Amino acid sequence: MCIRDRINAGGVLHNLGYWSCGTREYFGVKPVNTVEDFKNVKIRVQDSDIVRSVWSALGANPTTLAYNELYSGLQNHVIDAAENDLGNILLQKFYEAGPYVSLTDHDIATRMFLIGANKYNSLTDEQKQWVDEAAEYACKEQRAFDKDLNDKALETIKENGGIVNEVDKDSLIAACADAKDAAAEKIGVTDLYN
């Protein structure tokens, strides 16, 4: 059963599709190319046991720091790195304090496009078809817009001095396998990964 089916089977919400919020990338005072490069890197992360376990699996030292202290934390070497989507790296000018942007794509951020199940189920079949078609179109257009936005953000970061590199993602995936499995078990979604 996929996430969409699980939500729709719950009877409270009806999932019409998914929107993209970009992918999260590493940025910091040094680049990372392979899992070995993460060793002892103090990286600012969200306050989450699961998030910390993933970065620890890479050998990094996950550190909690308020978002509004992130820029100065990089400048003052309180942290070595952080992670966010390209749009926020650009808007907050994090590439100035942490000029190395390594394209880890470690978190693919999505948002669900939802409607109340009662409302959806009250529609006629024809109305449901209209809603479904409109939602499919909206999701497709939004994902294309988001991709374009992220592509432009990446180019602007480069134009303003950000140093961008690709990463050996296979080494990261392998290093995080146990953390991913533990997280899936903890939140009860192991079947979605299998």
Q: Model-predicted segments: where are they?
A:
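Short, small-residue-biased leader/transition segments that mark boundaries at the very start
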Residues: 1-3
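N-terminal secretory/targeting leader peptides
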Residues: 5-194
